Regions:
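Short, charged beta-turn/beta-strand-edge "cap" motif at the junction between a beta-strand
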Residues: 85, 97, 147-150, 197-202
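Reductase modules of NAD(P)H-dependent flavoproteins
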Residues: 1-79, 83, 233, 239-339
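Residue-level marker of beta-strand positions
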Residues: 21, 28, 44, 88-90, ...
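Short, conserved phosphate/pyrophosphate- and ester-handling motifs at nucleotide-, phospho-/glycolipid
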Residues: 138, 220, 312
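Ferredoxin-reductase
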Residues: 103-191, 210, 246-248, 273-277
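Histidine-anchored nucleotide/phosphate-binding helix
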Residues: 225-233
Length: 339
């Protein structure tokens, strides 16, 4: 069965097959809908449904959460990466415009260095086999992991400095039962994998001279690290604070790097807090990373600060509310959810 899909923004009509993935429809039709994670995590492909919402089937809870976290009404918008065609459909404007910077596109990268950080977290350094990579701190790459029956796409934030045009690094936690995370975690020097990108709107504010507060939990430190390295390499001494939350001592990583950066950049203030530390062996702060907002951020400071948050959705939402309550303008809070 064939269904007509109309893209009002591009003035394109395309005949899609029953059950065809809307990402494939957009690609085949040449529609200008932007895509990034292709897994319902980022909200990049959110598009207004003008007519035929019933043709997309029911929404998943994850899709609703992603739309709402991007300030979009789930009754008016759908994530096209999570939708299949089951009837006549008319689509309106995309919620997010296409990026002006052309991505590297699809390419093969080779593992240059594998660096274990904890028992479950590693840093992988990749060499771009052909071409050069240009990315903004905070962006991510999509990895094409070969599965049993098909290729699985997973997004990983770049953790390295953007000045290196031939290499990039990511931070990976091997999750129990996670096929993709374990596959990438097991890669070793010389191994190759296909990637595409870079993508993402989680970027540093252009031209801002306000102080900076960065909040990260777990491997959410990856894009924050890229931002931090970029900022500390610039001229200027505006105050930069990092609140880094982990569970226990065995989860600690990047501590030496953060300590070294503090020694060489006195205006950088990293703070590490553990939520579930062992009874002994941790002399530092204990609690949740959001506790630090209440304890260490004043209302005067919040009014002159840009915030960058990366971690699980509950932490992001709580931190946003706390910062807004402190007087921070919501437009100065940028975030990336990790799943």
């Amino acid at each position: 069965m064939i269904h007509r899909v109309t893209f009002q923004q591009d003035k394109i009509a395309y005949d899609a097959e029953e059950g065809q993935w809307l990402y494939d429809v957009c690609e085949a039709a040449g529609a200008s809908v932007p895509f990034a994670c292709k897994a319902g995590a980022c909200g990049t492909c959110a598009t207004q449904v003008v007519q035929g919402v019933e043709s997309l089937g029911p929404q998943r809870a994850r899709e609703i959460r992603t739309l709402e976290s991007n300030g979009l009404d789930p009754t008016q918008y759908r994530l096209l990466c999570l939708a299949d065609v089951h009837g006549t459909l008319t689509l309106g404007a995309s919620a997010k415009p296409q990026h002006a910077t052309a991505p590297l596109g699809m390419c093969t990268v080779r593992v240059k260095e594998y660096r274990p950080l904890t028992l479950t977290v590693c840093e992988q350094r990749f060499a771009v086999e052909s071409g050069k990579i240009t990315f903004s701190p905070g962006q991510y790459m999509i990895f094409h992991v070969p599965g049993i029956d098909n290729v699985i796409r997973r997004s990983y934030s770049i953790s390295s400095h953007p000045s290196d045009r031939t290499h990039f690094e990511i931070c990976v936690r091997a999750v129990s039962g996670g096929f993709c995370s374990n596959f990438i975690h097991r890669l070793r020097p010389g191994d190759c994998i296909k990637v595409e990108g870079p993508y993402g709107d989680f970027r540093l504010a252009d031209g801002s001279q306000r102080d900076i507060l960065m909040i990260a939990t777990g491997t959410g430190i990856a894009p924050i690290k890229s931002m931090l390295l970029s900022l500390l390499g610039q001229t200027g001494t505006r105050r930069i604070r990092l609140f880094f939350g982990l569970r226990n001592v065995s989860d600690l990583f990047y501590t030496d790097m953060l300590s070294d950066l503090r020694e060489t950049h006195p205006w950088f203030e990293p703070t590490i807090i553990l939520s579930q530390p062992d009874p002994i062996g941790w002399p530092g702060l204990r609690g949740r990373v959001t506790d630090l907002i209440d304890e260490q951020v004043s209302t005067d400071e919040a009014s002159n600060t840009d915030a960058y948050l990366c971690g699980g959705r509950p932490m992001i939402e709580e931190a946003k509310q706390l910062l807004i309550h402190k007087g921070m303008n919501v437009d100065r809070i940028r975030h990336e959810n990790f799943f």
